């Protein structure tokens, strides 16, 4: 996959750059303090082996230590990690809580949204 990049301070134009990537994007909002995020994590790890989309992890209202520890322990499925400690990107995307996942097409339009943990019924 791509190198995982960490955007430390989320800027609106970072999101615009990401949305312009000419691939299907799975944008997954998660946090180390979120128990259902742990439940869905193995599914994300499985998805990360496919190459027809990129997976963007938005670490939501979390600490850097917490998020790093979570990914070190459980594996990192993300091509790109955005640190959204203020919740700005969540506001931009109309987040209702974590975990929440948006599927965004090549043109940058949200085509699918999963509120709550991803499960094996979700088709990617």
Where are these regions (language model features)?
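Short pre-active-site segment immediately N-terminal to redox-active cysteine/selenocysteine motifs
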Residues: 23-25, 30-33, 97
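Conserved segment of the thioredoxin-like fold in thiol-based oxidoreductases
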Residues: 49-86, 98
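Extracytoplasmic/secreted envelope proteins and their assembly/folding machinery
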Residues: 16, 41, 45, 64-71, ...
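Thiol/disulfide oxidoreductase modules built on the thioredoxin-like
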Residues: 72-77, 84-124
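Conserved redox-active cysteine motifs that mediate thiol-disulfide chemistry
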Residues: 29-46
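Hydrophobic beta-strand anchors of alpha/beta hydrolase catalytic cores
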Residues: 26-27, 55, 101
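A short beta-strand-turn-helix
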Residues: 1-25
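Solvent-exposed loop/turn segments at secondary-structure junctions
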Residues: 31-35, 61-65, 87-89, 117-118
């Amino acid at each position: 996959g791509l190198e995982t990049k960490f955007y430390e301070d989320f800027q609106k134009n970072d999101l615009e750059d990401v949305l312009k990537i000419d691939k299907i994007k799975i944008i997954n909002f998660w946090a180390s303090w979120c128990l259902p995020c742990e439940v869905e994590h193995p599914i994300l790890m499985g998805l990360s082996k496919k190459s027809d989309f990129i997976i963007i992890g938005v670490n939501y209202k979390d600490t850097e230590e917490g998020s790093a520890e979570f990914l070190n322990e459980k594996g990192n499925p993300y091509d790109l990690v955005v640190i959204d400690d203020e919740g700005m990107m969540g506001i931009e995307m109309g987040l209702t809580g974590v975990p929440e996942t948006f599927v965004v097409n090549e043109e940058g339009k949200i085509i699918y949204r999963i509120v709550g943990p991803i499960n094996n019924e979700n088709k990617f």
